[in-house]
Amino acid sequence: MQKGVDDISFRACWIAALTDPEKLGTLSRERAANPRLQKCIYWLATVKQRGGDPAKIIDDANEQNKVSGKPYGEFVKAQLLRNLKIAEELGLINPEGLAELRKGNCATITLGPYKGEEATADHIIPRAACPELDNQIFNLELLPATLNSSKSDKIGDRQLDFAKKLNSVGLLSAKGLEAVLAKGKR
């Protein structure tokens, strides 16, 4: 048996709890999913450090949440893996960064032009444009704090395309899509 496999499999339970669509649907505080994203990055990074496959852990978590093979599960998986890559590129995967991420806090960037800034969780489609996506893990990404604040609630081509994709698979309502499209036309 591979060293740490049981420990690694245990992490799938954490990812499942943090990405459970039913639990996320009950969050009422604005931006309540942001710390959940940061905690997921912690668990996935520690899986990778122990020789595990983060994609497999997400698959296991999706299976536990009964979203395996469904659009929700696929979007969560893609976004978590993307955020893990971003965390690695920003130099967040170190003892200090992992300690912050484990608590659901912002970690300090240690690599690249934003070195010294905090990496914050931000909405791909801003909550001001579409509140129904506020607490969805698949709508969150890590960004340097200055980029996050300068982005504001702008809707560009990326957000429009993402909204259309989400709507086409039933993860964004027609009303939500209309709101994003209207914001994007300004």
Q: Positions of the model-derived regions?
A:
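Activation segment
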Residues: 127, 149-150
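Histidine-centered nuclease catalytic patch
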Residues: 107-142
